Amino acid sequence: MASSSFTSLSVMVLLCLAAAAVASAQLSPTFYSRSCPRALATIKAAVTAAVAQEARMGASLLRLHFHDCFVQGCDGSVLLNDTATFTGEQTANPNVGSIRGFGVVDNIKAQVEAVCPGVVSCADILAVAARDSVVALGGPSWRVLLGRRDSTTASLALANSDLPAPSLDLANLTAAFAKKRLSRTDLVALSGAHTIGLAQCKNFRAHIYNDTNVNAAFATLRRANCPAAAGNGDGNLAPLDTATPTAFDNAYYTNLLAQRGLLHSDQQLFNGGATDGLVRTYASTPRRFSRDFAAAMIRMGNISPLTGTQGQIRRACSRVN
């Protein structure tokens, strides 16, 4: 009986893996080449303009894609406002008060709808906008696989449980990424997104006041704008990369070598553990970082997409049709 149950479970697991592989296989970089040939150019122009107006927006759009893919897969669920039937993801602890860029996404969606209504999903817009944001700030490019569809619901609970917290140690970070079938290399490469953007005091306070693996001068610098008492200056911002905060480069890793990682989770990548070697490699070989980051972004973009007739193509990204 136990053997029969085990066999049935194995078959179910294989079927789930096969379904995931099929969904990813349905994505294609040329998905809109006939149905909306101007889609990618329209998105790129809007992203480039938004980042030129505010460099931080590049990091915000990249983060939106990451926070979308880690909850229910890359399905645009992070963009949904609360409704009478579900509470969205925007008020989850990792998102509340910090996730941003919705107005830019709405603007992009409106421009794309004007070109080809009802064709391009919000999930795909996030994926393309993330790539174009990185490029606009001097980072690598990659071919974005397309054909995702939009979810009709969101999950506050999954956003709270599945988005990696800045307080995680290396073991838990590795587990959080493994849950999404991302490797340790993916973890270290994708963390390099912290070469741009800002973080709130409440998310790095414990690191600069309590941790021992932090450069003393760096801790003093950050404490000037982040009081020790919780509730005091929680929303004060600091750059994740003090060296080149608006350039997408490999300075994040050189910062880690000097124990100048802003978040506890950042410095965990270079703290005497299994990822130290990869951090050193990325710090010394920017081309390797760019290559691995691009590959990891493609893999992350393949997390549980809705394809075919699943979900819908939202007319407005903040609500279901």
From Swiss-Prot:
InterPro entries, per database record: Haem_peroxidase, Haem_peroxidase_sf, Peroxidase_pln, Peroxidases_AS, Peroxidases_heam-ligand_BS, Secretory_peroxidase
Co-factor(s)? heme b; Ca(2+)
Xref: SUPFAM superfamilies: Heme-dependent peroxidases
Catalytic activity from the UniProt record: 2 a phenolic donor + H2O2 = 2 a phenolic radical donor + 2 H2O
Q: Which residues carry this modification: Pyrrolidone carboxylic acid?
A: Q26
Q: Which Gene3D superfamilies does the UniProt entry name for this protein?
A: 1.10.520.10, Peroxidase, domain 2 (1.10.420.10)
Q: Could you say which residues bind substrate here?
A: P164
Enzyme Commission (EC) number: 1.11.1.7
Its EC top class is oxidoreductase
Annotated site (Transition state stabilizer), which positions?
A: R63
Q: Which residues form each disulfide bond in the chain?
A: C36-C116, C69-C74, C122-C317, C201-C226
Q: Share an example GO biological-process annotation for this protein.
A: hydrogen peroxide catabolic process
Q: Does the keyword Transport apply?
A: no
Where does this one sit in the cell? Secreted
Glycoprotein among keywords: yes
* UniProt entry keywords in alphabetical sequence: Calcium, Disulfide bond, Glycoprotein, Heme, Hydrogen peroxide, Iron, Metal-binding, Oxidoreductase, Peroxidase, Pyrrolidone carboxylic acid, Secreted, Signal
Q: In UniProt terms, what function does this protein have?
A: Removal of H(2)O(2), oxidation of toxic reductants, biosynthesis and degradation of lignin, suberization, auxin catabolism, response to environmental stresses such as wounding, pathogen attack and oxidative stress. These functions might be dependent on each isozyme/isoform in each plant tissue.
- What protein does this entry describe? Peroxidase 70
Q: Name the gene behind this protein.
A: PER70
